[in-house]
Amino acid sequence: MTTANTTAKDNAATKKRGRKAKKRVCAFCTDNIDKIDYKDVARLRKYITERGKILPRRITGNCARHQRQLTKAIKRARQIALLPYTVE
């Protein structure tokens, strides 16, 4: 039991001393993109993992509005077979 407590304390200490992560900025806001186009497959692929999952907002740094639009665009592109649902 002491090893579990020690490990938890070490992790907490590392987080306190660790370097603070840089705040990510929404790429769509910086490029002044209002609507995300589902036909822009090259841009959409940046926000999909190698297994075909949509990356979350905390990783991509998108704002809530653009993350919702991005999700809809990816799902729409999957329906018309521009993007795969899963990668084999």
UniProtKB/Swiss-Prot annotation:
Composition bias type Low complexity, residue spans: 1-11
* Entries under Gene3D superfamilies matching the protein: Ribosomal protein S18
What keyword terms does UniProt attach to this protein? Answer: Ribonucleoprotein, Ribosomal protein, RNA-binding, rRNA-binding
Disordered: annotated span: 1-21
GO MF terms, alphabetically ordered:
small ribosomal subunit rRNA binding; structural constituent of ribosome
Q: What superkingdom does the record give?
A: Bacteria
Tell me which Gene Ontology terms the entry assigns under biological process: translation
Keyword Ribosomal protein (UniProt): yes
Q: One Gene Ontology cellular component annotation?
A: cytosolic small ribosomal subunit
Q: InterPro entries of this UniProt entry?
A: Ribosomal_bS18 (IPR001648), Ribosomal_bS18_CS (IPR018275), Ribosomal_bS18_sf (IPR036870)
- Quaternary structure, from the entry: Part of the 30S ribosomal subunit. Forms a tight heterodimer with protein bS6.
Give the family from UniProt.
Belongs to the bacterial ribosomal protein bS18 family.
Q: What does this protein do?
A: Binds as a heterodimer with protein bS6 to the central domain of the 16S rRNA, where it helps stabilize the platform of the 30S subunit.
Q: Which NCBIfam families would you find in this protein's record?
A: S18
Name recorded for this polypeptide: Small ribosomal subunit protein bS18
Which species is the source of this protein? Thermoanaerobacter pseudethanolicus (strain ATCC 33223 / 39E) (Clostridium thermohydrosulfuricum)
